[in-house]
Amino acid sequence: MGKSKKYGMNTKAIHTEKRVKLPTGDVMPPIHLSTTYENSQPGEYEYFYGRSGNPTRELFERTMASLEGIENFEEMHSFAMASGMAAVTLIGELVKPNENVVITKDVYGGTTRFFSEVMTKRGIEVNFCDLYDEEKLNSLINENTKLVWFESPSNPGIKIFEIEKYAKIVHKVGAYLVADGTFTSPFITRHLEHGVDIVFHSTTKYIGGHSDTLGGVVTTNNPTIWGNLFDYQKTSGAIMSPFDAYLCQRGLYTLGPRLRLHSENAHKLAEYLEKSEHIEEVFYPGLDSNPHKEVAEKQMDMFGGMLSFYVKSHIDLKVFWENLELFKLAVSLGGVESLIELPRLMTHDSAEGTEAAIEDDLVRISVGLENTEDLINDLEFALNAPKK
């Protein structure tokens, strides 16, 4: 696929070529389950051992790199890991004792837990910061800063950060800017094009897209970082299984159209909620009331399927969620089904008592692919349900 730069995102997702073609002429790539491969001569091989390389995983890694804008994706492929947190851990291996990491306060709870409970035990300084507070950010970064870590949109507050501005700030001290792109995927934001050094996704979410696969993927356009990650991936062993890689590759084929519908549904729900007498405030980058909509328009091709909101004090959240029919009370996101959760109680409890703590009445929605009117009616019924 030498002309990949000329192709659009959907075409790249569907037509990235396998490195090794089979004589059977499969139009859709099969799942390669073998854990070991025959040498033509001692030390001469296309593939050696399942942990160090697998055709199914490699195809997914090449496709992801292509979608992230890596021109030589045949060589600088992405790194597919066993889970989103395995991807986080892989990046964490870049940090050495006595170095420090700065993380935006509004971030996935598992990331908060990993850095505050695991990385600190390795002699690494970890600071949480509201990236909107540039003065605080500048006071925390220095020549010992290895990583500055953010999400845009953030989880669960759906905050939008001006990526290129923060890249300039971070690079002044020689640190790497890391983006969790799970909420967007490269179909919405290609973070590397905006100055990010490392982008990763929990493929469990939108990339897999059907709530039936677990994984994570890391991409960089920096050759030095890539070389280190390549070594870490092979030795850590936390690689994505062939079956999960197959499901993620299949998910990429429909990711563009799915995200378009996720975004359309979420935008309509956000507008409905903003007008509701039961809702205090809605956070969605596509709303005209969002102060960062202009920034979002510059770095997002669509506004995505995630939104959050505060209910007014007269709403009993337990009554609300118990009266929902289509929205399932569950963690995770990015599947075809709509999910609702209370971040403080379900995914961000590890932030309790820290600067990253979440308020009780914040509700997060992962908007699925159901008919919009059905989703609105479901919310309307639950919001107006009488207290017991």
What are these regions (language model features)?
Residues 2-3, 13-15, 67, 73-278, ...:
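Conserved PLP-enzyme active-site core in the AAT-like
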Residues 91, 228-229, 316-320, 375-379:
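Hydrophobic side chains in well-ordered alpha-helices
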Residues 72-73, 125, 139, 146, ...:
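PLP-dependent enzyme catalytic core of the Aspartate aminotransferase-like
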Residues 236-237, 324-334, 382-388:
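A common structural junction motif
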Residues 36-37, 220-225, 252, 311-315, ...:
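Short loop segments at secondary-structure junctions
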Residues 1-54, 62-63, 363:
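N-terminal "arm"/small-domain region of PLP-dependent enzymes with the aminotransferase-like
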Residues 281-363, 367:
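Conserved C-terminal alpha-helix-loop-beta "cap" of PLP-dependent enzymes
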Residues 16-18, 33-37, 51, 82, ...:
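Pocket-edge structural micro-motifs
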